[in-house]
Amino acid sequence: LKVNASINTFVGGYLCPYNLGHDGVLFRDESKKGWASVANLADGLTNTMDLLDDETDYGAKFFNPANDDVQNFVLQLLADLAKYDLDGIILDRCRYDDYGLESDFSDISKQKFEEYIGETVANFPADIMAPGTDEIPSDQPVYFKKWLEFRAKVIHDFIVKAREKVKSVNNNIKFGVYVGAWYSTYYTSGVNWASPKYNTSAYYPKWATSDYKNYGYADHLDYIFLGAYASVNNIYGSGEWTMEGFCKNGRELLQGDVPFAGGPDIGNSTGWTDGGQSAKIPDAIDACISNSDGFFAFDLCHVKKYDYWNAFKTGFDKYLESIEE
């Protein structure tokens, strides 16, 4: 049995709905408020720790990935984690927060962006994105795509540091990440999980600069997990939002830099939420494992809740029989 530890990388707290409270360093330590993301909302720049209505603002509270203090804090957590007898460490949520394109517009991010481009942004944030922008604008501000490139660089450079930190403690521990397989829109999270050999701008010129590819981080990983979270009726097919298509795209995007496992969300994706899908499990396994280097499922609690054990055994047995033929 191999043991891999997953860490909620840039999450600093959680606000629960239904008056159930909150937890995390961002809530425990008021002095860390400056570590939280700042969102470029329609109402103006807003620290996400000022958004505390548990009916509308519940969910994870993210750190600003560009904050050096945040990065040092997380790197120390990884160093501590690497001291345990683990086979691997997987970074989850190593990205910008769920506000997507609206994050992060802190003074720190502004300063680092200006240092990166060697210019002063005279009209911030409007020269990057108008307040409340949550999708590609038809009329792009002057720094829009360069800002997306910068965000990808922030995450890329942290991945490099994180790998170095883990390996410095225990070089035998494998280092990897979990990401969503929907690459065509994953730029909203500030992540380029592809190989740097994949020329992103050739396929996505609306949002990728010619240098965006330089911040693909697949070549810094020992493995990667791709969430192929298609609906129960979109298991086979091509293109995104089919499980098979997600995994086939993943192979093209990763360019052989790193082995990868694709897998479904069997508890939250459309058609999976109420259980009763045992007959679909073997197909989901086949679609993913036949087009990647492995398989994972999100999440074990759903396997137990809906008693999918036999369905998984059937799927794995079919796969093992197919490779023995």
What are these regions (language model features)?
Residues N4-Y84, I136, Q140-F144:
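Active-site-adjacent "subsite" loops/lids of carbohydrate-active enzymes
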Residues N8-G12, R93-Y96, G180-S184, Y229-S231, ...:
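Active-site beta-loop-alpha junctions enriched in small/polar residues
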Residues T56-L75, P141-H156, Y229-S238, I266-W272:
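The substrate-binding groove and active-site-proximal loops of carbohydrate-active enzymes
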Residues F62-Y96, H156-F158, K165, K213-G216, ...:
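An active-site-proximal structural segment forming one wall of the substrate-binding cleft
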Residues Y84-Y143, W182-T188:
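Active-site-proximal loop/short-helix segments
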